[in-house]
Amino acid sequence: MDSERDANSAASATPVAKTTIARPVSVPRKPASTRPPTKARGNDRAAAVTPQPEPDTREIVLTIEGLVKRFGSTTAVAGIDLTVRAGSIFGIVGPNGAGKTTTLSMVTGLLRPDAGMITVHGADVWGDPTAAKRELGVLPDRLRLFDRLTGAQLLYYSGILRGLSRPTVIARTKDLAIAFGLEDALDRRVTDYSAGMAKKVALAAAMIHSPRLLVLDEPFESVDPVSAANVTDILRRFVETGGTVVLSSHSMELIERICSDVAVVVNGAILDAGTMTEVRQGKTLEKRFLELAGDQTPAGGMEWLHSFSG
């Protein structure tokens, strides 16, 4: 008992430390930054949400699905798929023998495919050729005109065969002659035309019935720069008023300058297609084409050519 009292006395004699409660310290806030947020860098870019392009709601003018054409054991066109929308100038580029002309010949009903389907404004080119060809204006490669006709006669019969009335044909012939600079050439026979003039009168004949889709194979071949600029202006105005153009050309610079969309065709297949910006990927169309089609083969040998020894 005495020991318990002594312990309690000792405990009561020991001073108890007071607990101090710290008051919260007020820290002044920094003003909100007015600087724009920094752009994502490095790996942060992967986390950023890439905005999705808006769906293209323009009317589909031309659809090509699974198009195939063979000549004997050679496959000229190997399953091409392509969609062309209204209001575009769609360029098709490729090396010689790529299948460009063969493809356009099937699109316009001049050559029957071995497989696949082609529709123009919903009309099957081979299932309903009358409806499809009513919408088409065609400038074929290896241009052959009725060279015994004058330019005026060629345009006249082109319009009449398309079902236009005589007064309509005469009025449109006058308009087309002015637009293409052919006023002084209409009374001359087509056989006397230069290659460039023949190309222009053929393009005028392709447009006389006011088609909705122009399919032009090498429209600028043999055409001088002034006439080419004139034709380009006509095609742009045609597109601005609701028309659509599909054309082929070997001139990458020209295709890049005037076309809104492009397809690169090599060995009968499409290697890339889309808007000009999408296909170019920040390069010139020619450089992008060489990447896809393969760079040119270095010219070797032929040392004899530089010997000048006869």
Q: Model segments located where?
A:
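Conserved catalytic motifs of ABC-family nucleotide-binding domains
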Residues: 210
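Conserved ABC ATPase "signature" region
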Residues: 156, 160, 168-185
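ABC ATPase nucleotide-binding domains
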Residues: 2-9, 21, 25-32, 281-310
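Catalytic Walker B motif of ABC-type/P-loop ATPase nucleotide-binding domains
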Residues: 214-218
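ABC ATPase "signature
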Residues: 273-274
